[in-house]
């Protein structure tokens, strides 16, 4: 089918100024771009007053775990509605691919956060198998990183020990196979099991492998806060110690380092922002291709036990209630929150379990006040009510000023780091992340519009070596997002819907028009994105 989109304000993904022009789409690809294109087309769409760019490209996603569902649209619909057509998945070391099919630890892939649970189309140990599944049944385009946590789990489970030489070779072979099959890079999750057990020598092996194939290594650092459980409590801020570890890992290489979701967890961490970027800049000066990515929410999603140390979780219910353990837990918990710069008003219940929906959306402080008890006691009760498996939204992880400052840097990409939860309150980034970046740009609070668009289109495709994506030019695939700048600039933020996204095309198929999804087209509109 031939479609002519006329008179649109075109952002071509290069960072150049927008221009008024026409785009001719033939089948899956862009055939021509120019002004006054005179040609016969099956459909002519007048974009007068509207803007158009390549479909938005989420630079940091975990939607590989949801792309394998039998009905993936349920999980991807909110992203499509905010103009996203493509994803870089497999982040934080937690990829859905990268394990030996006969591994006794295969079910541990995902570190307990994700997994092949529920109604999936199958289990896909390799990148090749995952890509074949995406091409059969997916609404969106999916690139994937191979996760170190997944590969390490495959050969050694979650054991806290150095790998044997044989295990090391098997792990690296898994990662290399993924790169050879078109993975767009590798990923580390140094805060997750079993990535947290890897030393610098092990992560350096992974970095050198990514460098060999000229692909990025994305890194969830060991700490993103001023204090954590991973380093001695006093001295240099832990977020900076974690970055020091990456400096040591990359020393002497020319690797592509992608520092994931540059956040500053807790008010006590905000002061580290300049030093973090000074270190990244120093790495660049020493030959490391260092970049980072951000989302624009002030909160993050965490397990409800985020402030409960392992020793307390391992106690029996009876021992948890012993006065000495209660006192020790309370003192250490309050101290850690104070050192981080969190308060009980900052922790919102997102999900506890069936029949406990009345607590969703309330803060621990609110619930404690309703119950007439201390916040720490109420928090412990909430943990127990959820079986220590609840979920919270908490912050601050940043400020509007920090986000605006980071969003203007040349070495940043934009992303959501969000996924659809089965129950409870959702992360607002699934609804309104990329439109918010545009809204901030239009209001003078972010980068310029051409650069904003580049950081969510062509810049992402370039970084991860995805050919023929991210740009509006002849020969590129016709992933297109049409948006109304006037509506976006004046919109009142709504956490459950984006504003101003008028049309979305994925590989030449119009899948969203004025808020209505074409669910039939979306069954097979997406493609696997192989890196080259």
Where are these regions (language model features)?
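Acidic, glycine-enriched loop/beta-strand segments at the rims
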Residues: 11-22, 390-397, 402-403, 448-453, ...
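Divalent metal-binding pocket/active-site signature
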Residues: 183-242
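Active-site mouth loops of central-metabolism enzymes
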Residues: 59-70, 156-169, 195-197, 232-237
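Divalent-metal coordination cores built from histidine and acidic residues
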Residues: 69-185, 214-215, 288
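Histidine-rich, glycine-flanked metal-binding segment
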Residues: 1-4, 10-55, 73, 490
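C-terminal cap of metal-dependent C-N hydrolases
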Residues: 317-326, 330, 334, 404-411, ...
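Active-site neighborhoods of metal-dependent hydrolases
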Residues: 134, 139-165, 173-192, 233-236, ...
